[in-house]
Design a protein with these regions (language model features):
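Iron-associated oxidoreductase/ferritin-like identity signal
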Residues: 1-142
Length: 142
């Protein structure tokens, strides 16, 4: 049984490292978007993109702390070859799905601290998700 838990722990660390890379990529995209904003609502777009970039960096940092706590080594850099989705809603849905999977894995392994971190990230993602029209939208995670 212990070997199975170690295998699951290794899988979880690998999955969390993938999530760290995704969060860093998202932060990078938001920073680029903030720097290239040229619309009439430039200030609002820059504030929103900066806020989302900061949230993604907080998520990556929290996940890196959990990877260290689990005995792993956090992902070191942003993967430049990672495909980037133009559809923010689809990307947001994918993030929620991935974090729900991590939450289940953490629950199965009895990792309460990681569960708390993931719940906090999911809650923050709910607030930061936006539709194409620019209105805030809550995405259900049931």
């Amino acid at each position: 049984m212990r070997a199975s838990n170690e295998f699951c722990g290794t899988q979880l660390i690998e999955a969390l490292n993938e999530d760290i890379e995704r969060e860093l990529r998202i932060a990078d995209e938001h920073i680029a978007r903030a720097l290239s904003a040229h619309s009439l609502r430039k200030d609002a777009a820059q504030r929103h993109s900066s806020s989302c970039a900061a949230a993604a960096m907080r998520h990556a940092t929290a996940l890196a702390a959990e990877v260290l706590h689990l005995g792993g080594v956090p992902a070191p850099c942003i993967p430049r070859d990672m495909p980037c989705s133009r559809d923010r809603l689809a990307r947001g849905s994918d993030l929620f799905r991935r974090y729900r999977q991590r939450l289940k894995m953490a629950n199965d392994l009895g990792l309460l601290r990681l569960e708390d971190v993931l719940r906090e990230i999911i809650q923050e993602l709910r607030v930061c998700s936006r539709t194409r029209s620019g209105m805030f939208r809550l995405i259900r995670i049931n």
